[in-house]
Amino acid sequence: MAVCIAVIAKENYPLYIRSTPTENKLKFHYMVHTSLDVVDEKISAMGKALVDQRELYLGLLYPTEDYKMFRKLHNSYTDVMCNPFYNPGDRIQSRAFDNMVTSMMIQVC
Amino acid sequence: MEAAAAAAAAAAGGGCGSGPPPLLLSEGEQQCYSELFARCAGAAGGGPGSGPPEAARVAPGTATAAAGPVADLFRASQLPAETLHQITELCGAKRVGYFGPTQFYIALKLIAAAQSGLPVRIESIKCELPLPRFMMSKNDGEIRFGNPAELHGTKVQIPYLTTEKNSFKRMDDEDKQQETQSPTMSPLASPPSSPPHYQRVPLNHGYSKLRSSAEQMHPAPYEARQPLVQPEGSSSGGPGTKPLRHQASLIRSFSVERELQDNSSYPDEPWRITEEQREYYVNQFRSLQPDPSSFISGSVAKNFFTKSKLSIPELSYIWELSDADCDGALTLPEFCAAFHLIVARKNGYPLPEGLPPTLQPEYLQAAFPKPKWDCQLFDSYSESLPANQQPRDLNRMEKTSVKDMADLPVPTQDVTSDDKQALKSTINEALPKDVSEDPATPKDSNSLKARPRSRSYSSTSIEEAMKRGEDPPTPPPRPQKTHSRASSLDLNKVFQPSVPATKSGLLPPPPALPPRPCPSQSEQVSEAELLPQLSRAPSQAAESSPAKKDVPYSQPPSKPIRRKFRPENQATENQEPSTAASGPASAATMKPHPTVQKQSSKQKKAIQTAIRKNKEANAVLARLNSELQQQLKEVHQERIALENQLEQLRPVTVL
């Protein structure tokens, strides 16, 4: 079901981005970038609603995810992080991560 | 080699095929053949074969070769009888009636050609060929041309690095094993000098033992290989140009390791760790981490493996392969696997797609059981899949597991993390789905091990999100000691089963200050709120925050992320003694409560909106409130006492 998977760094550049070849990759790159705006908007919201909103936004994504993707992604991401040879900010070149992403893109597609 | 072949071709072309053509052998072949000839001659009772009359004799023309050693040798080559007859004919033994050195050598070369699938012709032996292979019995470490009845089906592979790999492709059935051997042997960098190769021959039959289904494979090759280590080790030309002695020794050790790898790399199993390699790895492990049952942290391992001069992506991939449970640290079997992969890579082997079964931690622990590894054994047995193991490995694992289960300590963090995760309501529902989703892939053991850890990481994500939200700390409004804040802390304690452990991670145990954003927040909070405690708060924060940060990392084995989510009680108990030492006992331990409550309340509110308050919380709130008031008074008093001391000291310092 996933047609595009991207991991964005803090500095808004992609650490990892991959999309199924059927669609135009550029379009997905744009989409990812615009989604960053949505996240920023959520984060920058002021007031008490901030935490609630964000939690609703992100929190629901995680525990109640319909597609069991985020967890796997996050687990693989932490695996990559655990690797002492990985410098934060590098592109993600882990084969295990690639395999997991491939499996996710294939699985429900 | 090519010159010799060309010369032989020229000579053969010059002289027709009537008599045995002058044969120029390579140095390797020369040595090998002369040895074989000597054995035949010696076995025949003659002296070392130098002169033709001393050579063994074989009755020409007999269908079944005589019991002479030469005949035995030829039979040991496992060629059909007619081929052998052809060979004896071609080499000229039949013509001259005996096996002189020339005939013998030609015959050997023809045998090699026949074994390579080439037709038995004089022209065949003009090209480079592998050394002939003979079936040997495994009496002791030496080659014996035993009787056919004694042959146990083992094969001796005389390694022979040749440029003509295509000749390996055409093989008989029995040479199929060599087909896998030679491509893997060829990348080895050692020069094809014959004596070490030949000396390796009697030991190599140990390798074939492993390939065949005979038992007792492991001890003999390991023992046999040891005497070979010395001559090979001396020939290892380690680049000792590194200025640092440590690095020089390391580089030399890596090149020695390469030699060890040469000796011990089973032709078809380069991923098997031998005994010497194992010992070497264990010694290196000990140099990094004295306790063999503990871990090497990621940074230490990174520094160590970086010295191997492999590229970072490769090291990263090796780490990925070898760190089976992906915890950022290497246990002894993981370390051995990683080291072995590095050595293999340096020797030119391409890195495998997945961790080979002989390098998996369960296998390594089973193959080399040591009492110190009991805890890891238990860890692996609780999660290992037998599917990957070969039958004999399973037997060994079962034996060791039965032996060691009795001594095993309390379950490791994987199991405890399971318990912790059971507490999380939000994760539980996802658990069975995740486990059921994972198919039985070769990586199942890894994925299974990853599952418990994944649950702990799932909590991390929420927590991290919360923390990041709090990171720019805003000074809270002043008097914040309300019921809600106090209640939040108690809710943690009371609702520990129901509250996600993220809270506990966020809320560092009360006596110590929470990590990262908290010290700054706590400072601000204390400034705002408790003026009397102002002087002590920063110092306390400074004291406790390093203490708090140190505690998770100092907890053995160093797995800080997981440790953070241990049940709060345990963490609380751990924290309390540590901070008690830093400050006044009871007051200090209770002092951070208000500060923690304030900041945690802010952080908690978001989560608490999702949690329902019930009446127990209210009762606890009231109780806590009274307790806090009392402690506040005590802290006040201590602060006053400290200020007095400060006043007393001040005049002294001024002077």
From Swiss-Prot, chain A:
<dbReference type="GO" id="GO:0005794">
    <property type="term" value="C:Golgi apparatus"/>
</dbReference>
<dbReference type="InterPro" id="IPR011012">
    <property type="entry name" value="Longin-like_dom_sf"/>
</dbReference>
<comment type="function">
    <text>May play a role in vesicular transport from endoplasmic reticulum to Golgi.</text>
</comment>
<keyword id="KW-0813">Transport</keyword>
<keyword id="KW-0963">Cytoplasm</keyword>
<dbReference type="InterPro" id="IPR006722">
    <property type="entry name" value="Sedlin"/>
</dbReference>
<dbReference type="GO" id="GO:0005783">
    <property type="term" value="C:endoplasmic reticulum"/>
</dbReference>
<protein>
    <recommendedName>
        <fullName>Trafficking protein particle complex subunit 2-like protein</fullName>
    </recommendedName>
</protein>
<dbReference type="GO" id="GO:0006888">
    <property type="term" value="P:endoplasmic reticulum to Golgi vesicle-mediated transport"/>
</dbReference>
<dbReference type="Pfam" id="PF04628">
    <property type="entry name" value="Sedlin_N"/>
</dbReference>
<dbReference type="InterPro" id="IPR044760">
    <property type="entry name" value="TRAPPC2L"/>
</dbReference>
<keyword id="KW-0931">ER-Golgi transport</keyword>
<comment type="similarity">
    <text>Belongs to the TRAPP small subunits family. Sedlin subfamily.</text>
</comment>
<keyword id="KW-0333">Golgi apparatus</keyword>
<comment type="subunit">
    <text>Component of the multisubunit TRAPP (transport protein particle) complex, which includes at least TRAPPC2, TRAPPC2L, TRAPPC3, TRAPPC3L, TRAPPC4, TRAPPC5, TRAPPC8, TRAPPC9, TRAPPC10, TRAPPC11 and TRAPPC12. Interacts with the heterodimer TRAPPC3-TRAPPC6A.</text>
</comment>
<dbReference type="GO" id="GO:0048471">
    <property type="term" value="C:perinuclear region of cytoplasm"/>
</dbReference>
<keyword id="KW-0256">Endoplasmic reticulum</keyword>
